[in-house]
Amino acid sequence: MQVTERFLKYVSFDTTSSETSDTVPTTAHQKELGRYLADELARLGLENAHMDQLGYVYAVLPATPGQEHVPALGLISHMDTSPAVSGADIHPQIVTYQGGDLLLAKTGCLRVKDFPFLSRYVGQQLIVTDGTTLLGADDKAGVAEIVTACEYLLAHPEVPHRTIAVCFTPDEEVGKGTDHFDPAKFPAKAAYTVDGGELGEIEYENFNAAAVTLTVHGVNIHPGSAKDKMKNAVLMAHQFISLLPEAETPAHTEGYEGFYHVTDVSGNETEVVLHAIIRDHDREKFEARKTFVENAVRYLNGVWGEGSFRLELKDSYYNMKEKLLPHMELIDNACAVMRAVGVEPEIVPIRGGTDGARLSWERDIPCPNLCTGGANFHGVHEFVPVASMEKMVQVLVELVRC
């Protein structure tokens, strides 16, 4: 099966994860794709292919004869899609991009003024959405590339390769992708996630991340008699937001610049719950950002009365660079392989996190991130070039070759 056909099959499964669910996985329908993948891997001939009760898919492709001594290498992608935009009833379209603005089938378009990098793909086949859902290239393109690479190796036993440990995780998009990862089922001490963006990107630096939950307690009084009595929690929450640096938001930052990002505000005059995230690649700046939020809350409690603002601040994950520096051969090998197949590698910082970041810190499995070829993740403008997915299959085959 070609990687494109495989990808189109995978995106037919709704695997949207949930920010609010406490189940594992957070949505039951992720297991539908998990079961399909486990069956497919078993049919192809991988060993121990199965989905565990928590929705994780594991499989092993043994080394070719004579290569059993070479350390195993892991390949990881995630099955879920972002809850930010609907991932149900996806209708992908394959178009040959002729340049200019690209109309989507049902609504909207990919505008060159918004996405000037589109010019790189003139003449290529792009898989795009119909404008009503995301596409799911994040990360079903990665899943399809890994499975297709394994299929190629099984069909070409003359290609010598090391043992390959495969894992497909649920709930990566909601930060829980490695919560229940079982290293006993993953015989590799180093791995790559295939969860990045455009072709050529290699990532081993990610954000340090923290989550903010701020509960604001107001006092509600009938507005007709509220003078000097009402404490409107909505306006109090707004005051907190106004203290955050206006230029340090996602819309005003790039590269290695960190930010504060308010993601959700709900409530009324009596109580408001605000959620936000803090991100920075630099650990000292990250800690300073957390201190800034704590000081802002302390100041507001001084203004409105102690207990008016209750802060919960929790670290989510850390920059994996510290864990990758002793294992830079993983980066060097990926760069060399890309050049060998005609792709110019580009080292870029991850403005987010990956399963690999947590595996690097929590499981001591150094795990940089490779591109999938896709772009514009988490939205209706998401797309992936067919040629980029095909090239990534070549990259993965060469990466595990001995």
What do the predicted segments below correspond to?
Residues 2-28, 128, 317, 375-379:
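N-terminal capping segment at the start of a domain
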Residues 22-70, 74-76, 80:
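A non-catalytic alpha/beta surface segment that caps or lines the substrate-entry region
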Residues 28, 133-144, 227-235, 383-390:
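Short, conserved micro-motifs enriched in small and acidic residues
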Residues 67-163, 168, 391:
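Active-site metal-coordination/substrate-binding segment of hydrolases
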Residues 119-207, 247-263, 267, 274-281, ...:
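Acidic/histidine-rich catalytic neighborhood of metal-dependent amide-processing enzymes
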Residues 119-133, 215-221, 341, 374-377:
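Glycine/charged-rich beta-loop-alpha catalytic/anionic-binding loops adjacent to active sites
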Residues 192-226, 233-234:
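Phosphate/diphosphate-binding glycine-rich loops and adjacent basic-rich segments that engage nucleotide
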Residues 233-402:
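Metal-dependent amide/peptide-bond hydrolase catalytic core
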